From Swiss-Prot:
Region (Disordered): 68-131
PROSITE patterns xref list: SIGMA54_1, SIGMA54_2, SIGMA54_3
Family that this chain belongs to: Belongs to the sigma-54 factor family.
Chain's role: Sigma factors are initiation factors that promote the attachment of RNA polymerase to specific initiation sites and are then released.
GO biological process: DNA-templated transcription initiation
GO molecular function: DNA binding; DNA-binding transcription activator activity; nucleotidyltransferase activity; sigma factor activity
Organism: Cupriavidus necator (strain ATCC 17699 / DSM 428 / KCTC 22496 / NCIMB 10442 / H16 / Stanier 337) (Ralstonia eutropha)
UniProt DNA-binding region: 383-402
Any GO CC annotation of this UniProt entry: DNA-directed RNA polymerase complex
Keywords for the protein's UniProt record, in alphabetical order: DNA-binding, DNA-directed RNA polymerase, Nucleotidyltransferase, Sigma factor, Transcription, Transcription regulation, Transferase
Encoding gene (name): rpoN
The protein, known as: RNA polymerase sigma-54 factor
Length: 493
């Protein structure tokens, strides 16, 4: 084959660094965005924080587009409508406009406005988590009870070892034999000694601490009570706990030879006990969610409003901008010029990130407005494509916006993805949100007769009477998702 040269014209999609950064920032959570900004501030001398609080320039126009207007100077009065979306969403241009290669290096034109003023708070006030951390842990509380006891150093050391061996529920999961093998051999502890100190530990508060299983935990608590049915309750937790767990009241009455009234009284006594005595002293990991968007009522409807506290306040460093302006075209400034470009990209991409979050949030609010007034039962079916088509964005963009972004509403704080979901058919040919169906199932079970609880089949029939076509297995799936026990486990005397 003879070698030859050919000219071919073709097109291919190339992601510019600016677009790549925009996509990456869009899918970051609030915490991840803060970390990204901190890293950029460390690495880029052209970038700095804006310390002044400025009113938001972000506005949603009547056609659904978002405009960034020049921000007025801060006024003493509280600004109105900061970072709010008030209109129906409409298609927007998802492009970047200019390429960011202009010569304007002034800091004001490239400042990422704060969109709203931050409320002043009392820094001296302790948070609920700080107050929680001030309370003693289970081990600290047990040590407080052990310290004043006049027992030998050997016994006290063994008691401390047992306290350290408890799990967070207050149980001793290791057997006495295992405890003995873990103790120093030279001390030659016998099982009887370990059992004696464990008995001492089980006399401490909270009642039930140091138990080796659920039956022993409940029995330890019952022995401290005075109740007409205490002995019957002790018999149940010691010998028939498995029957009580499955609510087999018929076999229980037969095994105990008691009437229904006595069994019911003993059951209520057992239910008043704490199966996990250590929980009251546990310190769960902080699981706080900072909302990206607030929803409030106003203007005859519901309005989405950006949370100003999660918005980075960035601008171009004035000093370096002046240096670059004066040294324009000179050699040796290429590095700073690149840093300037990166700073401008970051500021603009963060602006566009919050632009999309606001517009998507408002579109969700307008479609789920009944939810904000009536709760889950009023949730309507919604898919990502519906929002994407309305706003003129790609479905993948909506997915990125709704992942790890949270909305604070009168009904609670939810991830934006919460407002989307599958649907079930109705008899009229329409569709109902699976979230609304789950709420209905929860409502039906909450109103059931505990002596004759509703089966999954009966719940499906009741939903059918309301016009929802739901199979029994679907009811079971939704019930399990709600962590509601099966019908036999919900039955009571």
């Amino acid at each position: 084959m003879k070698p030859s040269l050919q000219l071919r014209l073709s097109q291919h999609l190339a992601l510019t660094p600016q677009l790549q950064q925009s996509i990456r920032l869009l899918q970051l959570s609030t915490l991840e965005l803060q970390q990204e900004v901190e890293q950029a501030l460390t690495e880029n001398p052209l970038l700095e924080r804006e310390n002044d609080w400025i009113e938001s320039p972000l506005r949603v126009a009547a056609d659904g587009s978002v405009n960034l207007q020049s921000a007025p100077a801060p006024a003493p009065a509280e600004p109105q409508g900061n970072g709010e979306a008030r209109a129906d969403g409409a298609a927007d241009d998802d492009s970047y406009g200019d390429s960011g290669n202009g010569d304007d290096y002034g800091s004001s034109d490239w400042s990422l406005d704060d969109f709203a003023r931050r409320p002043q708070g009392d820094e001296d006030e302790k948070t609920p988590m700080q107050l929680r951390e001030a309370e003693p842990t289970l081990r600290e509380y047990l040590m407080e009870q052990l310290t004043p006891l006049k027992i030998s150093a050997r016994d006290k050391g063994l008691a401390i070892f047992l306290i350290e061996s408890l799990d967070d529920d207050g149980y001793l999961s290791a057997s006495l034999e295992e405890i003995c093998t873990e103790l120093p051999e030279e001390l030659e502890f016998e099982i009887e000694e370990v059992h004696a100190i464990l008995t001492l530990l089980q006399s401490f508060d909270p009642p039930g601490v140091g138990a080796r299983n659920a039956a022993e935990c409940l029995a330890l608590q019952l022995r401290r009570l005075t109740h007409p049915q205490r002995e019957l309750a002790l018999n149940i937790v010691t010998n028939h706990l498995e029957l009580l767990a499955v609510r087999d009241y018929t076999r229980l009455k037969k095994a105990l030879q008691v009437d229904e009234a006595a069994l019911k009284s003993a059951h209520e006594l057992i239910r008043s006990l704490a199966p996990y005595p250590g929980h009251a002293y546990s310190r769960p990991e902080a699981d706080f969610v900072v909302p990206d968007v607030f929803v409030r009522k106003g203007g005859g409807g519901w309005i989405a409003q950006l949370n100003p506290d999660v918005m980075p306040r960035l601008r171009i460093n004035d000093m370096y901008a002046q240096i670059l302006r004066g040294a324009k075209g000179e050699s040796g400034t290429a590095g700073l010029q690149q840093k300037l470009q990166e700073a401008r990209w970051l500021i603009k991409n963060i602006q566009q990130r919050f632009d999309k979050i606001l517009r998507v949030s408002q579109a969700i609010v307008e479609r789920q407005k009944n939810f904000f007034s009536h709760g889950e039962i009023a949730m309507r079916p919604l898919v990502l494509r519906e929002i994407a088509d309305t706003l003129g964005l790609h479905e993948s963009t909506i997915s990125r916006v709704t992942t790890n972004k949270y909305m604070a509403t009168p009904m609670g704080t939810f991830e934006l993805k919460y407002f989307f979901g599958s649907h079930v058919s109705t008899e009229t040919g329409g569709a109902a949100s699976s979230t609304a169906i789950r709420a209905l199932i929860k409502q039906l079970i909450g109103a059931e007769d505990p002596r004759n609880p509703l089966s999954d089949s009966r719940i499906a029939e009741l939903l059918g009477e309301q016009g929802f076509v739901v199979a029994r297995r679907t009811v079971a799936k939704y019930r399990e998702a709600l962590k509601i026990p099966a019908v036999n486990l919900r039955k009571s005397l």
